[in-house]
């Protein structure tokens, strides 16, 4: 669906805020929630007085153009329409943070690993969230890409040298990359 589990919003936004990326790529923007929240908390909470002077780059990828609304054009600097498996390797921009929020389960494991590897090539850090218990999901909102194709587990992400799990009851949330060391192990969002 063009939305994601509301139980994970706090942990994801806290992680984005603590990393303070100057550039962010949101893969599978859907409703645009995380682009919107990143724009708000990275731009408006930095002590500035200029409300409409964005200093950070927030780009997105969306395979299903029917999800895009005029709000996306306000929040995102660029939205690339197409399959992330094709678009991510072709991107020339390097990002401080890449978001894969409730998207990796829409790929096979092989495709998901390839997408993650490509995201790690173009991004310093990748923030992933995927449901702990995947549900059967086929086409929704007339979008054939909404089908769940894989279930991911902790071990899929724990093999990365630079990673940390972010505590959540409903989702596996992992930060992969050097930013994992930035998040203090005593911080309440880190899983113990």
Region annotations inferred by a language model:
Residues 118-122:
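Conserved helix-to-beta-strand junction in the class I
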Residues 99:
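A conserved beta-strand element that flanks and buttresses the S-adenosyl-L-methionine
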């Amino acid at each position: 669906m063009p939305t994601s589990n509301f139980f994970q919003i706090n942990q994801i936004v806290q992680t984005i805020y603590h990393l303070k990326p100057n550039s962010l790529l949101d893969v599978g923007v859907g409703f645009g929630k995380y682009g919107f929240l990143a724009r708000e908390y990275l731009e408006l909470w930095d002590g500035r007085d200029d409300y409409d002077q964005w200093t950070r780059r927030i780009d997105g990828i969306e395979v299903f153009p029917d999800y895009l609304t005029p709000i996306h054009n306000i929040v995102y600097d660029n939205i690339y329409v197409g399959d992330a498996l094709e678009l991510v390797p072709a991107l020339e921009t390097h990002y401080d943070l890449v978001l894969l929020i409730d998207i990796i389960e829409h790929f096979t494991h092989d495709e998901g690993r390839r997408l993650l590897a490509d995201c790690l090539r173009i991004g310093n850090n990748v923030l992933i969230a995927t449901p702990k218990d995947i549900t059967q999901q086929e086409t929704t909102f007339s979008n054939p890409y909404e089908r769940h194709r894989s279930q991911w587990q902790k071990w899929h992400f724990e093999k990365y040298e630079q990673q940390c799990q972010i505590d959540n009851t409903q989702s596996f949330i992992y930060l992969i990359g050097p930013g994992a060391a930035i998040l203090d192990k005593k911080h309440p969002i880190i899983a113990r």
